[in-house]
From Swiss-Prot:
It comes from Piper cenocladum (Ant piper). Part of the 30S ribosomal subunit. One of its GO terms (biological process) is translation. It is found in: Plastid, Chloroplast. InterPro entries: Ribosomal_uS15, Ribosomal_uS15_bac-type, uS15_NS1_RNA-bd_sf. This is Small ribosomal subunit protein uS15c. One of its GO terms (molecular function) is structural constituent of ribosome. The gene is rps15. One of its GO terms (cellular component) is ribonucleoprotein complex. Keywords: Chloroplast, Plastid, Ribonucleoprotein, Ribosomal protein. SMART domains: Ribosomal_S15. It comes from the Eukaryota. The lineage of its organism: Eukaryota, Viridiplantae, Streptophyta, Embryophyta, Tracheophyta. Belongs to the universal ribosomal protein uS15 family.
Length: 90
């Protein structure tokens, strides 16, 4: 994965206005997850990073669940833009 790849899911103006929005938080978690995943491909025994990755995955999952309950249309758009798999339902 290219280190400087940028996910342009939310426009620059929206980023300046809505830094606390659910979509922006999910975007930031996704960027951190991809960066940590590429790090763990090189450093397989970095267990602290693995733990951090699992924590971030859980936080992003909770935010995605919240967004899907509040606004299903925005949830579907965001998943499509960020290329995230839809979670399995229990």
């Amino acid at each position: 994965m290219v280190k400087n790849s940028f996910i342009s899911a939310i426009s620059q103006e929206e980023k300046e206005k809505n830094k606390g929005s659910t979509e922006f938080q999910i975007l930031n978690f996704t960027k951190r997850i991809r960066r940590l995943t590429s790090h763990l491909e090189l450093h397989k025994k970095d267990y602290l990073s693995q733990r951090g990755l699992r924590k971030i995955l859980g936080k992003r999952q909770r935010l995605l669940t919240y967004l899907s309950n509040k606004n299903r249309v925005r949830y579907k758009e965001l998943i499509g833009q960020l290329d995230i798999r839809e979670p399995k339902t229990r």
